């Protein structure tokens, strides 16, 4: 079995509940984290609403009217990570405002380059975990995973997982039911996909790290800006 020690993973929780309020998404994050930690992956969870991340599309929002912004420091932790998992609840069939804020701040630094001249997130692996009621897991995952790949994260197979309750008001993931069991804990679909996602994230991150990442051929913004065209032919001159 591969040795995953040395890998780092960050889970961002887009819950709208400030600590110490209960986050159902945290419970699903814990399922994935425990698998990673059993295999030597260093993990941390950042609850976006409590993190001090300002709203905006600039790398440091203190330069644009905000009194404080912790994103520059958190961004350094993202750069040091191999795996980034964007997690959160569904509200009105969509990702929460805190989840969207995180995506916007990742986008704010999307122009940064790594030491190969590639976009900064090129050799990092992305995934997502979603919790909610009624509907929306696939819609939310679609938005998140599209955004991550657009920012150059590598998305492995089965990179999303989630749980949905029944339509209408009812228990959320992890809530205690009348019989003493916990809602969602017995869902084979959720448990299987969360496990597969976690392992695929680790496998892909390990492959990228051991190989030195994707070659900087045909994907270096630095080289493109320097005039390289990587066999591109302008159709106007064919």
Where are these regions (language model features)?
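Short helix/strand-capping connector loops at secondary-structure junctions
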Residues: 166-184
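N-terminal beta1-alpha1-beta2 submodule of the flavodoxin-like/Rossmannoid cofactor-binding fold
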Residues: 1-116, 180, 184-238
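Short, glycine-/small-residue-rich phosphate/pyrophosphate-handling segment
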Residues: 23, 115-170, 189-192
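Intrinsically disordered, low-complexity segments enriched in small/polar residues
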Residues: 160, 168, 178, 224-225
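Short alpha-helix boundary/capping motifs
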Residues: 64, 154, 172, 176-177, ...
